[in-house]
Amino acid sequence: MKKILLESEITDSLMPLEPNCEYLVENQQVSYFAVKTNGDLLVTNINNDELNLFKANIDLNRKEIIVFRAGGAGDILFMFPLLDEIKRRFPSCSLTVCCNSDYHFVATNCKSVDKVLSFPIKVKDLPEKCVILNLEGAVEKNDAVPAVDCMFWAAGMARPDSETIKKSLVYTPKEEDVRNAHLIPVAKNKDRIRIGYQWSASSPVRSYPHKNSCELVTKLAQDGGFEVCLLGEPDSIEIGSSPKKGWVYNMTKQGLSWEQSVAFLKSCDLVIGPDSSGIHFAGAMGIKALGLYAPFQWDLRTNYFDSVWCFQQRGECAPCNHHSNNKNGLFPKDKPCSQSGQCEVLATLNPDRVFKKALQLLNK
């Protein structure tokens, strides 16, 4: 990890930072803040002896353990089994998760978490003698190991048995949000199948190509006669024209929060999408889901979810295990996707195959 000191304020809504104040950040985040401040920041390396680092082989009861992870909602979800195991081993410890504020609702859903802090954290706000577990790169550096298992590896802890992990990988939405989910965009019709379709992943390399998605949604609505609810970031989808039959609703226009969007999945009979949070949370809530994979191996993300079935496309350049970030870019260099702006191997997954599998999962 590193310390950064800013000369100017960052007012970014996700990570607002004050000037003349030291923050503790992940190494990979330094470039982000450098861009945000036009280079007006001081970066300081941290020696291991400056921090009280997590060691699983010593007694951490009555200690405050802070677990750092600046990943997305799914990354926080994949931490649940590790957090539960830490609490089982050290029942009297105080367990804190430090993550992006948008995903606090995920961390607080884990029964073992006592407190949540926003990332990045001010150095002066670190509790005295706290124990730090940094999970930066835990998943990204281990492309042959399931994401959940990577968390244990990074913490230096043995992985519990699969059944124990499955019991931890559970997300429980608020009852009020679930009730509201059945009322939007229209009241859920018990005689009509509702499909939640996540239009894209956070990284374009993992997204099912636009043309394929359009064909699939049309088939689901027109041929299947289903209610199809399009999921994604707020205002990220524009519908040009709807199929003549069926019902297609653009949920990105509903003004839902992240937490409400996850709860909305509970109103769906089936969730379809690429390697993304929609598939992961559907699995964590026991909802039937159909994942569309190519850049990453399906079982690295969904192997502990019994309700999820996945297509795995393979080709000369897939799985490529490409993690999109400031350093790596959106797509692997010198590959077809870097020119076309989409995963060409995932594009070979015919929407008709996905449609037929959806019918099978729905017992139609």
Regions found by a protein language model. Give the residues of each.
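Catalytic machinery of carbohydrate-active enzymes
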Residues: 1-364
